[in-house]
């Protein structure tokens, strides 16, 4: 099988396919762009950090790469509930690329080619191979498209534009035409990136410092990482001001977005600075996070300040910001427009309904973000390889993972703008925490051939430790005097009486370290595992309620819909429901119920019809 593209999606797709034993080739326009970070030099964040943990639990590469190349680590949302805790790290952009390139080079059964793919070979509705710019022809049973923003890429800075992918890469225009000819429903999306500036031109004394978490609190992304972690750099925060906003508004028509040059739809949850100023006119300031791009470079990334305004305007509005008065722009901000597919034309396996054997991943599927891309890449590569090998493919239901939620949203609801994973998109987020991704997904990764012996042994060892400690906490009793002394020492009002450790941990003010101070730490229990156990105990009632809801939803998921089912014959359905059900062709009643425009009464009518049909 073949993977087109070696960005975050392509890396995971190629690695997964080769790990499964499929003879695999990955094609990239440049070996120097493998694992490139064309936007922010970071991994993780709210919901995204959970995706990385899930990817790692399934046997992916991103978590290991982030642990090996991080500069600073922070756990976001620590003041909120565990469902939204999110690990985020600053990474060394160059070292991340080198790690990923080497990881692919070391993957058995994987061939790497520097070549532009200009066409697909399709015969009788099934992919047969690819053609490169140098007229190379390669046959394959399955192909994964992981094209990022290169597909029909067009860069905009003010009224200037040129055909290009990110970071000066070539635009893949010929491949776009080949995909259109094959009948894939393409659309135009847009994203953007801020300027990169020289460290020496920033007055850090006028900015807010944003340090990482204390070293003794740092957690890795990968369940395989045991090495101690240490923060290496600080990040900083600057703020726009009314003068910044005036400069932007005075020049807003020079923005290709507002001047009508850009037709692609931009990301709703990652707007440009000009979008922020226009849409949030009542705000006096917006934060800009100043982040290093690496240890051996002076480039700094200005997160929150992407723009497509002309260079002279960029210079003016950046220099109006306190601490940026002498700013030197090394790379100007730009917007990039690109082609992607309507994801409702994909199966839940990420295989195209139009061209069989063709899979999509990442921004090609209408998503934004490295983490979303990587997670889809693993699933697409896994399923393409299993398809090529004649094995059953993997579909992850929503309740199993954020990855399952993401894919279900894409193929069932579709997207109107670049899709970003958020905790609010999951109705099961209390059970889909980042700390238990291994329990949820590593057995699945093992069953489907991705999880190797070393990871499986580590997983089983961790599960044994957790289970032993659950039993100990269930049985251990804390005497009243011991508990009162521990609570007094912790500055808490002493409890009236002692009790079973597990029951005591249900109280919001009592934490594992306090209990362990009395009965001792469990064998093999780390602070990370202790926090996980405490979360399970404190939220047991809510988790049980979600489990019941999952079982109820699973009933709908088991009600399958025949592929040739005629929705047009069901006069009880609304016209909108009939049209959308016919176009999307849901696999089961559960998926049908999540299609926008399909009402509960439509689902009830469909359920009756399916019962009669069987």
Label the predicted regions.
Residues 33, 193, 351-354, 385-418:
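Active-site-proximal substrate-binding core of FAD-dependent oxidoreductases
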Residues 133-142:
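Core beta-strand elements of the Rossmann-like FAD/NAD(P) dinucleotide-binding domain
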């Amino acid at each position: 099988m073949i993977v087109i593209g070696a960005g975050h999606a392509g890396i995971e797709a190629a690695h997964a396919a080769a790990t499964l034993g499929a003879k695999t080739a990955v094609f990239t326009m440049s070996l120097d762009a493998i694992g490139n970070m064309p936007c922010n030099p970071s991994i993780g964040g709210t919901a995204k950090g959970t995706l990385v943990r899930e990817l790692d639990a399934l046997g992916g590469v991103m978590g290991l790469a982030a642990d090996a190349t991080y500069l600073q680590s922070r756990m976001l949302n620590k003041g909120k509930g565990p469902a939204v805790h999110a690990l985020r790290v600053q990474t060394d952009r160059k070292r991340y690329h080198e790690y990923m390139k080497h990881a692919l080079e070391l993957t058995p059964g994987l061939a790497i080619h520097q070549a532009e793919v200009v066409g697909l070979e399709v015969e009788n509705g099934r992919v047969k191979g690819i053609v490169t710019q140098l007229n190379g022809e390669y046959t394959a049973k399955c192909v994964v498209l992981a094209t990022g923003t290169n597909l029909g890429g067009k860069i905009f800075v003010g009224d200037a534009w040129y055909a290009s992918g990110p970071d000066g890469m070539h635009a893949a225009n010929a491949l776009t035409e080949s995909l259109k000819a094959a009948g894939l429903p393409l659309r135009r999306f847009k994203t953007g990136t801020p300027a990169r500036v020289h460290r020496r031109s920033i007055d850090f004394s006028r900015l807010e410092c944003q340090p990482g978490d204390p070293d003794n609190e740092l957690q890795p992304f990968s369940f395989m990482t045991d090495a101690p972690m240490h923060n290496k750099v600080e990040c900083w925060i600057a703020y726009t001001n009314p003068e910044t906003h005036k400069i932007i508004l005075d020049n807003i028509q020079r923005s290709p977005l507002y001047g009508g040059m850009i037709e692609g739809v931009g990301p709703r949850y990652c707007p440009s600075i000009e979008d922020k100023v226009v849409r949030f006119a009542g705000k006096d300031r917006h934060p800009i996070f100043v982040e290093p791009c690496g240890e051996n470079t002076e480039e700094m990334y200005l997160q929150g300040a992407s723009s497509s305004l002309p260079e002279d305007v960029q210079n003016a509005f950046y220099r109006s910001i306190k601490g940026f008065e002498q700013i030197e722009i090394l790379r100007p901000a730009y917007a990039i427009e690109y082609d992607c597919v309507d994801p409702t034309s994909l199966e839940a396996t990420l295989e195209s309904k139009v061209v069989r054997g063709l899979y999509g991943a990442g921004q090609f599927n209408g998503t934004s973000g490295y983490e979303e891309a990587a997670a889809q890449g693993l699933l697409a590569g896994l399923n393409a390889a299993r398809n090529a090998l004649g094995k059953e493919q993997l579909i992850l239901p929503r309740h199993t993972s954020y990855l399952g939620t993401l894919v279900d949203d894409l193929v069932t609801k579709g997207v109107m703008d670049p899709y970003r994973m958020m905790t609010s998109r999951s109705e099961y987020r209390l059970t889909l925490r980042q700390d238990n991704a291994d329990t949820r997904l590593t057995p699945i990764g093992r069953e489907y051939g991705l999880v190797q012996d070393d990871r499986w042994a580590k997983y089983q060892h961790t599960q044994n430790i957790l289970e032993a400690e659950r039993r100990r906490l269930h049985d251990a009793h804390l005497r009243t005097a011991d508990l009162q002394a521990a609570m007094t020492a912790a500055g808490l009002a002493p409890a009236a009486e002692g009790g079973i450790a597990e029951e005591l941990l249900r109280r919001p003010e009592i934490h594992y370290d306090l209990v362990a101070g009395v009965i001792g730490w469990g064998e093999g229990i780390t602070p990370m595992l202790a926090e996980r156990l405490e979360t399970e105990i404190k939220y047991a009632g809510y988790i049980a309620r979600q489990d019941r809801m999952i079982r109820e939803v699973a009933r709908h998921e088991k009600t399958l819909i025949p592929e040739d089912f005629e929705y047009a014959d069901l006069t009880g359905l609304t016209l909108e429901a009939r049209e959308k059900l016919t176009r999307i062709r849901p696999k089961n009643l559960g998926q049908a119920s999540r299609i926008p425009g399909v009402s509960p009464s439509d689902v009830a009518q469909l359920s009756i019809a399916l019962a009669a049909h069987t």
